[in-house]
Amino acid sequence: MANNEQKRDEGYIEKLVQVNRVAKTVKGGRIFAFTALTVVGDGKGRVGFGRGKAREVPAAIQKAMEAARRNMIQVDLNGTTLQYPTKSAHGASKVYMQPASEGTGIIAGGAMRAVLEVAGVQNVLAKCYGSTNPVNVVYATFKGLKNMQAPEAVAAKRGKSVEEIL
């Protein structure tokens, strides 16, 4: 699993999570192609992921990066950590993420770590259960981050004060 990181002029951090060779069987044999899974973020709560497929690795990575920039979401962070513990699943992959105190760092594995790093989360405890397929882990992590809301937003929706919610 590659963990390549680049900073672009737009201020986005780009990470390559996975490159995979796939084959299409045709009458004359096999046609090989490559798929790429990437995550892109600004380190301040905006994060996106993308998948690309092409005959050559660089082209697949480029397509994945473009898809990731189009698929960005805003995550409500509590400083450098998450708002509250959260669980999420996609397919057979289940992820659990919980906020951590300052100085803890990112305690997460593989694909989940890449997503949290580019999102700007610096202190978190995370665990992946079930399938560790990077594609499903990234989807599950995104679901968890997307569904997380700041207490202020929840209070505003309910028409109550933050103190009443907490």
UniProtKB/Swiss-Prot annotation:
The record's annotation in Pfam families points to:
Ribosomal_S5 (PF00333), Ribosomal_S5_C (PF03719)
Q: Say which family it is in.
A: Belongs to the universal ribosomal protein uS5 family.
The protein's UniProt keywords, in alphabetical order, are: Acetylation, Ribonucleoprotein, Ribosomal protein, RNA-binding, rRNA-binding
Q: Please give the subunit comment from the record.
A: Part of the 30S ribosomal subunit. Contacts proteins S4 and S8.
Q: Identify this protein by name.
A: Small ribosomal subunit protein uS5
Q: What does this protein do?
A: With S4 and S12 plays an important role in translational accuracy.
The beginning of the lineage is: Bacteria, Pseudomonadati, Pseudomonadota, Gammaproteobacteria, Pseudomonadales
Quote the record's domain comment: The N-terminal domain interacts with the head of the 30S subunit; the C-terminal domain interacts with the body and contacts protein S4. The interaction surface between S4 and S5 is involved in control of translational fidelity.
For biological process, the GO terms are: translation
Transmembrane region(s): none
Q: Which NCBIfam families match?
A: rpsE_bact (TIGR01021)
Cellular component (GO) terms are:
cytosolic small ribosomal subunit
Q: Does the keyword rRNA-binding apply?
A: yes
Which GO molecular function entries does the Swiss-Prot or TrEMBL record give? rRNA binding; structural constituent of ribosome
Which residues get modified to N-acetylalanine? 2
Q: Which residues form the S5 DRBM domain?
A: 12-75
The gene behind this protein is rpsE
Q: Which domain of life is it from?
A: Bacteria
